């Protein structure tokens, strides 16, 4: 019984990681790492900084998803987020969900 419960816990953790893993694969596919990193500054803010900035915003995934598609300026000083029109609304939300999950 104990081993069965351990396997159930492991399977549950793997299942929970599934969407985040898929979202990270989208980060790679959409070339987000050309300008951003998980925990180091490159050209734009790193994912941890973004997650911290939007942490208390209840509609953060929607706001960030729109920012990904439309681009923007002024949020991170002189940094410019160029628009990404090739990213669909659903993909932008998935990318935002991943970025916001980074701690």
Name each region found by the language model:
Residues 21-38:
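Sequence/structural segment immediately N-terminal to covalent heme-attachment motifs in c-type
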Residues 57-66:
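Post-signal/leader-peptide non-cytosolic segments of secretory proteins
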Residues 24-25, 44, 61:
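Short, structured helix-loop boundary elements
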Residues 34, 43-54, 67-96:
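Axial heme c-ligation environment in periplasmic c-type cytochrome domains
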Residues 99-103:
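Short hydrophobic/aromatic patches at helix-to-coil boundaries
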Residues 1-8:
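Bacterial N-terminal signal peptides that target proteins for export
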């Amino acid at each position: 019984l104990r081993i069965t419960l351990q396997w159930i816990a492991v399977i549950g953790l793997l299942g929970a990681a599934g969407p985040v893993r898929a979202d990270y694969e989208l980060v790679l596919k959409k070339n987000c790492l050309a300008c951003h990193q998980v925990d180091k500054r490159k050209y734009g803010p790193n994912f941890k900084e973004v997650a911290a900035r939007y942490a208390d915003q209840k509609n953060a995934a929607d706001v960030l998803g729109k920012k990904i598609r439309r681009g923007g300026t002024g949020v991170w000083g002189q940094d410019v987020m160029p628009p990404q029109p090739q990213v669909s609304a659903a993909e932008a939300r998935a990318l935002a969900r991943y970025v916001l999950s980074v701690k």
